[in-house]
Amino acid sequence: MKVAVIGGGPSGLVTLKYLLAAHHFQPVDPIEVQLFESEDRVGGTFSYRTYDRAELVSSAQLTTFSDYRWHDKSVDYLSAAEYVEYLEGYCDRFGLWPHIRLSTQVEKVERTGKGKHRITVSHDGQTSTWDCDAVAVCSGLHVKPNIPSIPGLDRVPVVFHSSEYKHVRQLGQNTNVMVLGTGETGMDIAYFSVTADSTKSTTVCHRNGFVIGPKRLPEIKLFGRVTSKTPGKALPVDLSRPYLFVNSYVHRKVRGTLQTTLSRWTVKAGSWLVTGTTRGFDQWVGSLPKDKYDESHYFYCKSTKAMPYISAPYRSHSWVHRLRSSIIQAVLPDTGSRKIDLAPWPEYIDEDGVVHFEKNSHPDSKVLLQERRFRPDVLVLATGYTQSFPFLGSDYCTPDHADQRGIWRTGDESVGYIGFVRPSFGAIPPLAEMQVQVWVLNLINRLPGPLVADDSYRLFSNPSGRIEYGVDHDMFAHRLALDIGAAPSFFQALAHGWQVTVFWAMGGTLNTKFRLVGPWAWSGAPRIICDELLDTVTGRRSTIELLTQLIMTAIVCGIPSILLFLADLLVALSIRIYQAISVVSSRPSKGDSAVTENRG
């Protein structure tokens, strides 16, 4: 079998690795694979669309692949440059380089009949083709910049997309900076702007609200004393969600909407408890409309450094807030006199370069109406990216039509889309690793069975929103593990010792956990769990944090699931007892049998 992989980012590299390794885990012949990358190095967005001081918002423990870890276990978040270094090391470790063709642009993918494909590529001005049996599209979500249509955009002296941002020097001297977009990149650039001595003012524009979520568990002060076991190095949030009763042993009626609703209310209550607001972590303004906050799922912005500068003018100073914060309060940075103005989305920019904002009911809109006209000198479009597949023929589907876990379309299994889902909390690379495990098994006819219909892991999409491919990271990873029989049970974890069992139950949903059993089981998985990952449970959390997590997990997921499982058991027993009684009562007695015989 021959397979082409398009794209040399994390998703493409992990796809290449599993295709090359398939014959070591399954009884199949070695697969011939070629990876085509248009740039001159691997890494994708992390190599070419990043900036100074850029840091991943997903933890190193979660983002790195199951069988190759970052060398420094004390590091929680990698810089973009460090992550590219990690990916290059991944290529070294698994011998991927001979199968990677850099500076090679895929011009066209077309079908040649009998289920095969032809890849047309260009390199150094030369065009060539490569025929194959399957194609893995791993070109990524962050390639083509999304440019909003705003009349008068060209009337601002300096305008550029965030993909072009490299250094704070680009924001100029003594400038009024406006950032469009409240995602991680937009918030990062706003933070760099407000803390730079070279800029005059910083304004961030949002469409219709956003939600801030910390990427680390907040450090808490109880009666003025910090309680964290590791001050300044709190546990990443994406490692804090336990596996037991959140993913494993969850009743079907709890999983999905009910589980998410309970979890959301828990998050809102926790946010109020430590920051005084339920809108988001220390988020006093810019919240989503109530109907969207309560009924739809949303993507958290995990870049929190800018939020204190936005919230400062809006924080409550009521006696309730003062009392609460004197008892319990998240540790927040001192912003001094610096602030970031929050504004609605621009409607248009007039001939004088003055921005006219859309009117809405948000408090920031009312504040702007009372202030002077705003004329930006620098405008940064942190408006994300759009999906584009110019190389695909018209008879190929796109990821939004891939109905099998977002990987392939039914009936067209030889074309896989890897890494085209976006988690709210989590990371794309580990989900891509789980997706490719499923796709490769299906490709070689080793999938345990048909994929069970299950959309509980999907996030509800906002009809007016740009992103419609959101998933809950932990639920999706667990679902993919179930698909291939790689989700370990309690007893399977226990077979590897108590340390693995503790991490299985209380640790985050990390892919190494899914290498304990199943078709991709790997003997090195228990060692990584014991040497590195167990520390996220036993070494990084205080007694208060562990007890709080146990109690909240039991309340939100554990108790409802246990009660429902018991109810199912009682119903099943009742049915069996009723059936047994019915059978007994329907049998003729011995006397009745004798009378019947005499009559005969």
Curated annotation (Swiss-Prot):
Q: What is its EC number?
A: 1.-.-.-
Keyword Flavoprotein in the entry? The reply is yes
Matches recorded under InterPro entries? FAD/NAD-bd_sf, Flavin_mOase, Flavin_mOase-like, FMO-like
* Cofactor(s) annotated in UniProt: FAD
Query: What is the superkingdom listed in this entry's lineage?
Result: Eukaryota
Keyword Nuclease listed? The answer is no
Q: Name one GO molecular function term.
A: flavin adenine dinucleotide binding
Q: Which UniProt keyword terms apply here? A: FAD, Flavoprotein, Monooxygenase, NADP, Oxidoreductase
* Pathway terms, separated by semicolons: Secondary metabolite biosynthesis
What family is this protein classified in?
A: Belongs to the FMO family.
Q: Describe the function of this protein.
A: Monooxygenase; part of the gene cluster that mediates the biosynthesis of the indole diterpenes penitrems. The geranylgeranyl diphosphate (GGPP) synthase ptmG catalyzes the first step in penitrem biosynthesis via conversion of farnesyl pyrophosphate and isopentyl pyrophosphate into geranylgeranyl pyrophosphate (GGPP). Condensation of indole-3-glycerol phosphate with GGPP by the prenyl transferase ptmC then forms 3-geranylgeranylindole (3-GGI).
- Mind telling me what this protein is named? Monooxygenase ptmN
Natural source organism: Penicillium ochrochloron
